[in-house]
Design a protein with these regions (language model features):
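Extracytoplasmic metal-acquisition and chelation regions
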Residues: 1-184
Length: 184
């Protein structure tokens, strides 16, 4: 389970005997965290599985199975919807592979390190301004190192999420000769 400590705390706080806990990430091969502080605070695994196309598909199937078990009357609907969603994601995956097959540049930079599964799935290299959990502001040293990385790897776009400070993304983009593109 990718979010075990968080899920257990939430379930205990709910104090609801009828609550069904779904391990949406069951069967996933997790991206392991390497920063000891992040592991201590958040657990051993990157929780952003849904940002992988295959991870999102797996989670949808696990959720559908749990819903079907809890609500057998509508089980077929849950399962069909999950299969349809998985098929749509498979189309996206094939298109992504086709569109990036000849890409010489495999590096990208984001506001926070949420795309580890996507990077793993498609042989990409992710760098980020902030850590996996978008906590704290980056140091000037970190921004300088990222700017150097961007120039070396010809990274022309810094992807910035809503949760991350736009100032850091703008500063990095200016230093690296790149542009900032918002992602949601």
């Amino acid at each position: 389970m990718l979010f075990r400590s968080w899920a257990e705390k939430t379930a205990a706080a709910a104090a609801n005997d009828h609550l069904t806990i779904v391990t949406a990430s069951a069967g996933a091969s997790p991206v392991k965290l390497t920063d000891p502080e992040e592991v201590k605070e958040h657990g051993a695994n990157d929780p952003h599985l849904w940002l992988s196309l295959s991870g999102a598909s797996l989670e949808a199937k696990n959720i559908a199975a749990a819903l079907a078990k809890r609500d057998p009357k509508h089980a077929q609907t849950y399962e069909q919807n999950a299969e349809r969603f998985a098929a749509d994601l498979d189309v996206l995956k094939k298109q992504f592979i086709k569109d990036t097959a000849d890409a010489k540049r495999r590096a990208f930079v984001t506001g926070h390190a949420a795309f580890g599964y996507l990077a793993r799935d498609f042989g990409l290299e992710q760098k980020s301004i902030e850590d996996l959990f978008a906590e704290g502001e980056p140091t000037m040293k970190t921004l300088a190192e990222l700017a150097k990385y961007c120039r070396k790897n010809n990274v022309k776009t810094v992807f910035a999420e809503e949760l991350v400070s736009p100032a850091a993304s703008k500063t990095l983009a200016e230093e690296a000769g790149a542009k900032v593109v918002a992602i949601y």
